Amino acid sequence: MQINGGIRFCEQGMKASIRAMHVQSEVLGMINENVTGFDKVGFQRREPVISAFTEYLGIHGLSSTIDDAPGRIMTSQNPLDIAMANKGYFQIQTPEGVKLTRDGRFKLDKVGNLLDLEDNPVLSDAGMPITLPVLPENATQVVVNAKGKVSVYDKESNELLDAGYLGIVDSNGMAVLNPDVKQGFNEYSNVVLQNEFMAVKPVVRNFEANRQIFLLESSNLQKVISQLGSAS
């Protein structure tokens, strides 16, 4: 739009800058979520995916994907803490359905059911809750091998009794054949703080550029309104 006096106002430019700032705010939110999750067990970072049409779609052109790379594995000394060196997810039966998670901090109840920290059953490769055939005197009598096979020491027979395999699957629900299970370890997030901080810079720079466009167009709009008022 141009009126007498040569003042130009681009409505589309203002709308585009608003949409862009909205998208960049959401991207910053994802980065902040990743940084916040740095020290969380089983946390996986989110990667923003920006559509080629985001300029027109705004926030509807933004999506995200989960980075499924393994995180940092650290010893915990708790035999019921289970981590995976390869990709995959444990299956947990919740009231809302089966949940996939990398958080392998488990515990036993009084009858030998293997549970997560929220008392939800851990599922086997057969899709059933894992229950130990005998109740161990302590957690050190529970053995989990690299394939995810769970066993428990039976004092009476002096041998290990099988309790099944952990139901480890990929994001599509397909069985993972070589999860490389680590007993007595926790897996912390796969977030690399340096990468997240580096990712902030271009987002902030783009946000500031669009903010300047918005302020310029907003100023021009005020001038247009003022001149239209003077002409009436």
Where are these regions (language model features)?
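Amphipathic alpha-helical polymerization modules
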Residues: M1-S232
